[in-house]
């Protein structure tokens, strides 16, 4: 089953949202307090964590995103875009014609971070603040095209923080709803075609359902449990944790494709965050690599070297 985004008026006869059988295929980002909550989660996870310094640094980035969101609102009518594009992600990260709005977000993030980040990070911020619009666009294009080695690691995290906030603002403006149709490729975000950072088994109105969380636009999309989120096979799945069976963070590995993705359980800890808890459990990543599995996701605060 794949998911595509269509305008409300194009929706066919789907189960009513009030129906017991209705499963929301897509949860668009709710930006109210998202970054504030994420920052608080980073701060909580930093306690007694071997990566405490970096988690506290990540908390500052989330707070800067919250401030940039507040100071740089974005409201767009995306109905024409949804009507023109069928069968593809409406905000595809590689083809969507982005505006310079993300430059303003980056400038705001840089201004907020200058006084709170370590000296080593200040150099990168200063260099970014002096970069031309062309240079910024070149770095953004490289990251969005998965060409991570073209952007130095000390700059990529800030560039992506601005791009992610921009895409999240766009996704939050989508007036259509998601419609489920047969197909493949649920391993990518149906809104922007980026990859997940982790998956989460939720509580509340979506109790027990597993959603993948986009590492770019913050959208979540439904993928059934007991299925590999990378190859969609079901035969060789295993679950790993560092603590116990009741751990709120586990790794779901697939023996068929050799990949793994973190899976978070809100019923075990209602405060889990798709980005923060993934980053705070790097020791689990090391364990999975020792077992011979390759990560099928990217954390927006920790890009690969190549």
From Swiss-Prot:
> Which NCBIfam families does the UniProt record give?
FdhE, PRK03564.1
Q: Which GO terms describe its cellular component?
A: cytosol
Q: Does the keyword Cytoplasm apply?
A: yes
Role description: Necessary for formate dehydrogenase activity.
What biological processes does GO assign it?
A: protein maturation
Alphabetized, the UniProt keywords read: Cytoplasm
The gene name reads fdhE
Q: Main subcellular localization, coarse class?
A: cytoplasm
Check the record and name the Pfam families matching this protein: FdhE_C, FdhE_central, FdhE_N
Q: Which GO terms describe its molecular function?
A: ferric iron binding
Question: HAMAP family, per this entry?
Answer: FdeH
UniProt similarity note: Belongs to the FdhE family.
Q: Which InterPro entries match?
A: FdhE-like_sf, FdhE_C, FdhE_central, FdhE_N, Formate_DH_accessory
Q: Which residues form the signal peptide?
A: none
Q: Tell whether Acyltransferase is among the UniProt keywords.
A: no
Q: Where in the cell is it found?
A: Cytoplasm
Residues in a coiled coil are none
Q: What is this protein called?
A: Protein FdhE homolog
């Amino acid at each position: 089953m794949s998911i595509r985004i269509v305008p409300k008026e194009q929706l066919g006869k789907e189960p009513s949202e009030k129906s017991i059988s209705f499963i929301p295929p897509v949860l668009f980002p709710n930006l109210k307090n998202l970054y504030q909550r994420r920052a608080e989660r980073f701060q909580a996870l930093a306690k007694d964590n071997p990566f405490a310094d970096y988690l506290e640094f990540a908390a500052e980035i989330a707070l800067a995103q919250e401030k940039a969101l507040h100071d740089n609102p974005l409201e767009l009518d995306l109905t024409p875009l949804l009507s023109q594009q069928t069968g593809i992600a409406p905000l595809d990260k590689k083809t969507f014609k982005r505006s310079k709005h993300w430059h303003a977000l980056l400038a705001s993030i840089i201004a907020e971070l200058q006084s709170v980040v370590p000296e080593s990070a200040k150099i990168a911020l200063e260099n970014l603040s002096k970069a031309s619009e062309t240079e910024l666009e070149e770095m953004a294009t490289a990251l969005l095209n998965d060409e991570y080695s073209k952007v130095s690691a000390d700059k990529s995290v800030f560039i992506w923080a601005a791009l992610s906030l921009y895409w999240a603002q766009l996704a939050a403006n989508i007036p259509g709803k998601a419609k489920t149709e047969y197909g493949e490729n649920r391993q990518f975000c149906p809104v922007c075609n980026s990859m997940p950072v982790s998956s989460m088994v939720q509580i509340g109105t979506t109790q027990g359902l597993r959603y993948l969380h986009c590492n770019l636009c913050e959208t979540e999309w439904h993928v059934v449990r007991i299925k590999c989120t990378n190859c969609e096979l079901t035969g060789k799945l295993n679950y790993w944790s560092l603590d116990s069976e009741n751990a709120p963070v586990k790794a779901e590995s697939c023996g068929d494709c050799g990949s793994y993705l973190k899976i978070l359980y809100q019923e075990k800890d209602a405060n889990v965050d798709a980005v923060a808890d993934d980053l705070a459990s790097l020791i689990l990543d090391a364990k999975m690599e020792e077992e011979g599995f390759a990560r099928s996701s990217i954390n927006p605060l920790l890009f690969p070297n190549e």
